[in-house]
Amino acid sequence: DDIASLDISETGREILRYHQLTLTTGYDGSYRVEGTVLNQRLCLFHWLRRGFRLCPSFITSQFTPALKSELKRRGIARNFYDDTNLQALVNLCSRRLQKRFESRDIHFLCLYLQYCLLQHHAGITPQFNPLQRRWAESCLEFQVAQEIGRHWQRRALQPVPPDEPLFMALLFS
């Protein structure tokens, strides 16, 4: 228990230093990461990629089922987060960007897009400052990200927040 507490404290210091986020303890003993949506997403990006390298079984047995369960619980149409559809979308991005994604990258991107979809559905979107916005808009990946946004918007009949394609450009860069 002491070792776990030390690990949690060290993780809290690390995410504060690298991601400007704080780890807070709830009344029930649970933990919550607090900070901007952009910083939270970048933190998840970092740790999820790390998780794929260090303990892929945890991602497969814990993270993925919890994410899919939440997508289902929120009533999001299955065709949005279906693995086959998302893999096709990632493969389309790969062709448009002329980038080859390894199978682990495809798995990561599909999971991450599911997470973004969950946040989008909840009305949670990252905010970019003008400098970050200009950088993201200048990337080739931004055009592809806009295409993903149009794809989601056509099927969901719900507008995509303007900063969501900026984040997807960052995700694919």
PLM feature segments, named:
Residues D1-S173:
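A cross-family "folded-core" feature that marks the main globular domain of proteins
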